[in-house]
Amino acid sequence: MENTQENPTDQTTEETGREAQAAEPAAQAAENAAPAAEAALAEAQAKIAELQESFLRAKAETENVRRRAQDDVAKAHKFAIEGFAENLLPVLDSLEAAVGDTSGDLAKVREGVELTLRQLTSALEKGRVAALNPVGEKFDPHLHQAISMVPADQEPNTVVAVLQKGYTIADRVLRPALVTVAQPK
């Protein structure tokens, strides 16, 4: 009887040879792909390093801007009244001159006080401080403080007299005016 079946060893050798031939292009492709993958990896790592450096620079710049802003605010608070104080210096000079005057001339003293009052009023106006003199106006509890109510010929709740002026600075009340108000009839 003739052996029609091939030797199993021969078959395995042939399969191994075919597999080796088929694996060769795959191995070669893998070898070719490895440098490309390494290059892509190196490029990605370089990009990451660049982005990290850019992030750190941006973070440092943001911190510098924040610090400068804080310094500016601190300086603004520290020197906020500098201009106002400069406007008050002539008033101080006038008061010192009046104290140093020993002439005893009341007319001269009165004139000096009036001049000093004008200087002070001017300094306050430059600092946006405005006087409240609300005679004849309707009573406003935000601007006025009623001390008393008196019978008057004026409309009820109208300011009849100002006992002490009030003051505002840039539309904000520094001190309300002390007033007497017409009582309802």
From Swiss-Prot:
Compartments, record wording: Cytoplasm
Tree of life domain: Bacteria
Keywords, comma-separated and alphabetical: Chaperone, Cytoplasm, Stress response
Protein's UniProt keywords contain Cytoplasm: yes
CDD domains, A to Z: GrpE
GO cellular component entries: cytosol
Disulfide bonds: none
Biological processes annotated in GO: protein folding
Biased composition (Low complexity): 19-38
Comp. bias (Polar residues): 1-11
Region annotation (Disordered) ranges: 1-38
One Gene Ontology MF term: unfolded protein binding
Annotated InterPro entries: GrpE, GrpE_coiled_coil, GrpE_head
Family designation: Belongs to the GrpE family.
Quaternary assembly: Homodimer.
Function: Participates actively in the response to hyperosmotic and heat shock by preventing the aggregation of stress-denatured proteins, in association with DnaK and GrpE. It is the nucleotide exchange factor for DnaK and may function as a thermosensor. Unfolded proteins bind initially to DnaJ; upon interaction with the DnaJ-bound protein, DnaK hydrolyzes its bound ATP, resulting in the formation of a stable complex. GrpE releases ADP from DnaK; ATP binding to DnaK triggers the release of the substrate protein, thus completing the reaction cycle.
PANTHER family per UniProt: GRPE PROTEIN, GRPE PROTEIN HOMOLOG, MITOCHONDRIAL
Protein name: Protein GrpE
